[in-house]
């Protein structure tokens, strides 16, 4: 081979290498841009500062279900923001169903803790996910563990005790005479029993769209259960947006 041919071959290799490197660099740049965009979109961002407790009701959604929640009722300050939530924890005074006084002092008089607890109705709203709906739980789960026969309390509610050795031992199902498990019409709660200084607590559950609402209140309140039932209905209705 002539010297001139060797010179041409030698100078040709870098040019071909440079030509191949340009598309590779371009692809790497595009990949970096795409990765940066994906990281920006998916990277978790800290929510904005919570709003003041005395602000107007916040529009929120839980599992797509809309609610209007007064910030003063939100027990967790970081939950006091509009938008999507997985869960909110609320408290309302009973029987007014107003949010607790956000301006009240945090100091409590001796013995006031128990009184404050029983003067409030607690509400938790969560995304239902794969959890069984309350109506299905009543039809398919509770009958496996509850006693067959029901007693009747002086307030007119029927009571079925859960058997010992079951997941719900120490608790009772309490429902009115018109309760129908096939339609969920009527009033039904699951209540723990009082144990010494610890009062029994009742749970009322309802599913709205894909969100579960659980209302907690002292079992002693069931002496006037019709007022409790009406109050729960009014409370849930007040949390729902007006159509």
Whereabouts are the PLM-identified features?
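Non-cytosolic head/periplasmic domains of membrane-anchored proteins
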Residues: 107-196, 200
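N-terminal Lys/Arg-rich, disordered targeting/topogenic segments
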Residues: 1-20
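Hydrophobic membrane-insertion alpha-helices, especially the h-region
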Residues: 21-41
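Short acidic-hydrophobic surface loop/beta-edge motif
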Residues: 58-62, 204-206
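Extracytoplasmic/periplasmic/luminal assembly and interaction segments
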Residues: 68-122
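Surface-exposed amphipathic alpha-helical segments
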Residues: 209-243
